[in-house]
Amino acid sequence: QYDAAFLGDTAQKRIYLTFDAGYENGCTAQILDTLQKHHAPAAFFLVGNYIERNPDLVRRMAQEGHTVGNHTYHHWDMSKIGEMEQFRQELESLEMLYRDTTGQELAKFYRPPQGIYSEKNLEMAQQLGYHTVFWSLAYVDWLQDDQPTSEQAYAKLIPRIHNGAVVLLHSTSQTNAAILDSLLTRWEEMGYSFGEISELFPAG
């Protein structure tokens, strides 16, 4: 319903890597290097100030074949927005900024800031032509003053991986940047491959 998904095909050993990027703190280049090494596509959900401050990284994401999705311009609590005009402005402002930065069109994938949404939001996103992308596997990786150890991250992420998983990671996490190479290797050894989030919406 409302063209939203949190899970891929559970009959396939395929997983979907997604990164939420509210700001840049020096981890993204390493993450992109690791994704390139593994030939792993990912989706990056970006906000306005991220694109404004890091145009080179955003262009690199696009050039290296990753999906860039809409995390709204201001990263507000969108559940408080019930008017289409304001909702549209949040998404279309980011579309324009991305177009000006990369010369490309932003992919029509939306992730609500902080995962907070109303049913009305999902309906409005759909009316604007967006697929809403949630997730089925995440862990507390966004606290800068309380980053998980590598061991804690592995313990959360490796046993809980599953067929069709949409994995939410934050690109601001030093732990994620440090472990990503070995994490992807481990998942590959378990028989998983990495898919494009467009596969979550086979009809469209």
Q: Across the structure, where does each feature detected by a protein language model lie?
A:
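Low-complexity, Gly/Ser/Thr/Pro-rich intrinsically disordered linker/tail segments
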Residues: S173, T185-G204
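Conserved, mostly hydrophobic/aromatic
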Residues: D20, L35, F44, V68-H71, ...
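Alpha-helical scaffold elements lining the catalytic groove of polysaccharide deacetylases
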Residues: N25-C27, W76-T102, I116-N163, N176-A178
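Structured helix-beta-strand junction loops
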Residues: H38, E64-G65, L128, N163-G164, ...
